[in-house]
Amino acid sequence: MKQLKMVLIVGDGMGDRLVPSLGNKTPLEVASTPNLDEAARRGQAGLMDVIAPGVPPGSDTAHLALFGLDPFEWYEGRGPFEALGVGAEVGPGDVALRGNFATVEERGGRLVVVDRRAGRYLPEAEELVKALNEELSEVEGVKVRFYHATEHRVAVVLKGEGLSDEVSDTDPHEVGKPVQEARPLRDTPEAKKTARVINEITFRSYQILKDHPANKRRVEKGLPPANIVLLRGAGMMRKKLPTLQERYGIKAAAVGATALVLGVARAVGMDVIVPPGATGGVNTDYKSKARTAVELLKDYDMVFVHIKGTDAASHDGDVENKIKMIEALDYVLGYLLDYYDGEAVFAVTPDHATPVTVKEHTGDPVPVLLYAPTLIPDEAVEYNERAVRKGILRIRGRDLINLMLNYSNRAKKFGA
């Protein structure tokens, strides 16, 4: 029995709702997607609750589900995945946090957030991270290390005795709100110590960054200064995730540029590749991702391709760029089909919906597409939120990999 390759393409935040400016259509309905529509016509489509009905997934919990794990059982915080995705080693007892370079102003003795992403485009990020690592390497005997992820994002790893991830964020998650003080979420010495350390990191980052030459240059150009690091999503890796090799016997690779998602992929045993020109934004070189995926399929059983630009555009409420990135994903699928049609099982899905009118993740079901050479087609003939309702699939996120394994002739029998 011939085993087929497996290709999973995820359009981050690609799911949407009706957009009035598009004549009450979704970006997927408006975008030109000949390859997605042809795959839908020849394959099976439907709706998927990535986590559970009505539950807005984070990108980390969503990908745990797409990789076949129950996020309610395995999720222990976003920070460790972000750190793994930028190549950090996160050991037992370490605390990892997700961070944003942000812009704050001093108002009435408080630091008030005016831009949570410091304009998002931040070519000075490596320079700022270097300054932080030189001037803020230790707090209360705890080693502190900053890692640049993509755009405005950083990961921070704390190493030392007596740490806890049971602490709140310093990121207020809203513009116009003051920077928060991290609080212990449990009355333990470890949580209290970690909260103090996180507060010290946050407010010292402001002292280091506010007058940094890179920020002076940004202000001169009319750009928002990246003058603080806001922290959130503390987590510890208490238990090792089972790998795809251990669970399914497959060798897998991930193609993308978003640290958080690549960290989840790395945690489940995938080899991680960031292609030339991949940025994690709308300016990514998606053709480079497609070429890289084709090459990797020569040596790997499964390749996962992540397209982040759809989500970046959604969070900005940018309909035009969302449509552009959907069409980029369609190109990636078409390019891969040119090489592996008949030789692979293809699955395409968002990891969650990020409607451009909401600008945040929502719990809407997302359109999912499955195509394999001998799969019996259903009645769906286009790929979008409305058209896939004619399809046969109505699944959870963690069911998708089982379907891919089944149609690639790799599924293991359950029972005698």
UniProtKB/Swiss-Prot annotation:
Keywords carried by this UniProt record: Glycolysis, Isomerase
Pfam families: Metalloenzyme (PF01676), PhosphMutase (PF10143)
Disulfide partners: none
Biological source species: Ignicoccus hospitalis (strain KIN4/I / DSM 18386 / JCM 14125)
EC numbers on record: 5.4.2.12
Enzyme class: isomerase
Known function: Catalyzes the interconversion of 2-phosphoglycerate and 3-phosphoglycerate.
Catalytic activity: (2R)-2-phosphoglycerate = (2R)-3-phosphoglycerate
GO MF term list: metal ion binding; phosphoglycerate mutase activity
InterPro entries reported in the protein's UniProt record: Alkaline_phosphatase_core_sf (IPR017850), ApgAM_prokaryotes (IPR023665), Metalloenzyme (IPR006124), Pglycerate_mutase_ApgM (IPR004456)
Name of the featured protein: 2,3-bisphosphoglycerate-independent phosphoglycerate mutase
